[in-house]
Amino acid sequence: MNNRPGTLQIYFQLMKLRVVILLQITALCAIIAHDLMVRSESIPGDRTWLDTLESCIVTLVGGTMAAGGSNAINMVYDKDIDPGMSRTRTRPIPNGWISPRHALIFGIILAISGSAVFIPIHWKAAFWSFFSVFF
């Protein structure tokens, strides 16, 4: 068993935050590209810079939470195979830094909360965020 990191670091490891950051960069690029196309009248729509900023903030917060929750749930699902692989044996659950039950509760709360962040923007965004947690 390795030296136990701090609690916050364990949660970040459960979320696979480095992977989520790459996902979020892609999402932000898509938002900005879309809104630039709207402003250049390449596609129909009416978006202000404030709309773009709001979409980016909501996507960063909600997307990070939903994807991080999904990753935590996946680590619980893989708890039986992670100890046997060199790449995954240092994850928080195989090391005993956090219980599978605790990680599952964290993942579910994070995924649901992250998906709920999208509700004020559009219910379809919230639906697809929640739906994607399971894939």
Predicted regions, residues:
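Histidine-/acidic- and/or cysteine-rich, low-complexity loops and terminal segments associated
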Residues: 1-8, 27, 40-49
